[in-house]
Amino acid sequence: MYCSTCLFFIYALLCIAYDLRSHSVPLIVHLLFVLPGLIVFGSQLHGALQACVLTTHQVISDTPAEASSAALPLWHPIWTALLPLLPGLLALLISRLSREALGLGDGLFLLIAGLYLQMRSMLLLLLSGILVGFLVSAVLLIHGHIHGRSMRKVCFPWIPCTLPALCAIAFSQFPLL
């Protein structure tokens, strides 16, 4: 678990560094971290499938009254494993539909993060990025208004806006002694 978390933080810090320096993340950085992410995701999906098999076995072996009182649907573990990929897939769709107003690299970052993180951490990452991005946009807009410049075509790197969430995730994964 710690190994996959460390891999994700290395990936995130590399993306932040490249995004700050050149406003883009090289595709090779994304590709280097996809395979380990798929391995982590595969192990999570394997655990979810095992939980489904166990639940199915319990439902089959129990009496009908006990089987109907199951708390969670059979597909719940699989849905829980797949759900963290949704923000990245939506970001890639928005990137495509908006002709990359939202960068392709940002969507890839969220999709690859979904391979490593659970849904709660993904939501924190996404909401942090949106909130900090809003604050940066507001500051840029006010700065442009004060100096009489149009800020209509100004863009800024979004991945560094996720840094507060990355810090929170790091502190939750690696508690201080």
Language-model regions, residue ranges each:
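A membrane-topology feature that recognizes alpha-helical transmembrane segments
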Residues: 1-177
